[in-house]
Amino acid sequence: MRLKKYYFKRIKSTNDQAAQMIKKGKEKGIIIADLQIKGRGQYGKKWISQKGNLFMSVFYKINKEKNLNFLTNYNCRLVKSALKKFINKKITIKPPNDLLINNKKLCGILQETIFFKLNKLIIVGIGVNIIKSPNVKGYKTTFLNDFTAKKINKMIVFKSISKLFEKNIRFL
């Protein structure tokens, strides 16, 4: 399923933008931003968005009976699969929604659901540390390019993740 891409230079939050688009009648799409100034993680925690890293959200309609725990795990596996193409390191899923390398956070995924006009939609916010990782007190972080011989551009990672979602969401 082809998903329309929406690009923003600067945005408050890709998930918030997806929610606004859903409320305007869009049922699916992918949002990417160069800079996210009010990104958030699970439990309302602030997501530190450093320029050059990847900030995106995928949104699509889902079956109302679909188990959200299943979707969280499924979406994490899709992102993990996309990232594995770039490095030869073990990526682990720290439930419910973090991807780690050597017990350091590489990627955070924030999943939210919205009901609009009798439809249930999911927003999958994805933040990947590509060129640098934030300093977070009490939390170890890492970045993708720390494990590659050749530096990777965020757009290549964006295309890889987008392609997997486009290929697989029709099964949800």
Stretches found by the model and what they are:
Residues K84-K117, G127:
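Acidic (Asp/Glu) carboxylate-rich active-site/surface patches
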Residues I131-K140:
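Cytochrome P450 core scaffold surrounding the K-helix E-X-X-R motif
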Residues A149-L172:
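Conserved, helical-rich catalytic subdomain that frames metal- and/or nucleotide-binding sites
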Residues N145:
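Structured alpha-helical
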Residues L121-I131:
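Active-site beta-strand/loop microenvironment that shapes enzyme catalytic pockets
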